């Protein structure tokens, strides 16, 4: 089967973006042909010369050795001055038709909310259905939508909030109607979508989002904690202001005997590097290689995310897969995976440093509690790899 997986941009750190590349890898592991279909952008910056796409005849170019790590088709796109700051595809319903015909796509999977890719894909699907109903010989290409719909909108300005509410009101119902299958992370997200009168049989609930490469690394890579410290706490993800990564500097100042490891990339990376130069216990990691991240995770007594908004929370699952308890921000979907007080904790607010430190102190003083939490986390996340999700999608759209 040939599958196109559509996402706003590629990333090694942003869960809602890297999930698309993870799914491409998963389909390919199962023997299918799959491509990431995305914008010009990787981590917010152009991944190739924009002129290559602008001057292409069909509005897209294929990049075999793409920075995303998977075969990638990059399409006409821009970063308009929209309130949401989202990437926008240009003329995508036409381009998607060209891609589908050129690559013989048997399925199109579209990820994420609050951007125009899902709406354009839904319009393309609606046109094909209309043509088929009129008697045209149209290739059946199911549309799978993975909304990553998290109702706790992160809005720094009223206009941003209004834009997301309008998208939910005007665009989401149309997309849900046109999709052949909806994939959601958990029963809570399914309940949100049923408010739009989505038939239950159209919804596939799955938390299988762990990168198979990361899972293999976690299974085989030994822990390698920085020397000279009693224990390690860590964060892996985007380094931006809304992720509250400045709090790790504060934590490093408070935990003199612990290593505070921060792995990621983003606008706050340079500042964190400078802070790490004057604090031996603040360790910055810029590599996204699975073995490196696996070592960070397995060396940690606990993982944490202080984000103001995290709509997917896959990193939490990776920590749990390794048997590492996780502290989830209330504005992170990780709070839907972590059972409070069982395999991690729910922070009362996104900047709850003292609450997190009190919990870590307890884990260090009572290793039997930490080990029990770790066992429960590992049991919950066991087998939640993306290849199982890919197989479930293929089974549902083939039936």
Language-model-derived ranges and their functions:
Residues 302, 325-329:
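Short hydrophobic beta-strand element within catalytic cores of glycosyltransferases
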Residues 132-133, 138, 142, 152-174, ...:
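Nucleotide-sugar donor phosphate/pyrophosphate-binding loop at the beta->alpha transition
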